[in-house]
From Swiss-Prot:
InterPro entries xrefs: DUF423
Pfam families to which the protein is assigned, alphabetical: DUF423 (PF04241)
Gene Ontology cellular component annotations, sorted alphabetically: extracellular exosome; membrane; mitochondrion
Residue positions, PTM N6-acetyllysine: K43
Compartments, as annotated in UniProt: Membrane
Protein name (Swiss-Prot/TrEMBL): Transmembrane protein 256
Keyword annotations: Acetylation, Membrane, Signal, Transmembrane, Transmembrane helix
Transmembrane segments annotated in the record for this chain: 64-84, 93-113
Gene: TMEM256
Species, as recorded: Homo sapiens (Human)
Intervals, Extracellular compartment: 30-63
Amino acid sequence: MAGPAAAFRRLGALSGAAALGFASYGAHGAQFPDAYGKELFDKANKHHFLHSLALLGVPHCRKPLWAGLLLASGTTLFCTSFYYQALSGDPSIQTLAPAGGTLLLLGWLALAL
């Protein structure tokens, strides 16, 4: 397993470690502006974990570069918009979430190829 496939496996592992770090921060250190912020943070974290696992499967599909790029960029856009809004209370970048979600959907479909 070499090239982009191995890189996405490593990225999935690093992303999973980051998701665990965010989960710990959300549970023990974060100060949320309101209850909705905590809900958004938990939603982002759940998706962060799930799509980190999906990245680990990228080396086993026929189009690892496509699947990996779609999943990685989708996870970044989707989760970042929710993490940011949850911690700051500022919804200004929430418009990135639908774009990220679309990329995630396409990434899952690319895994099926």
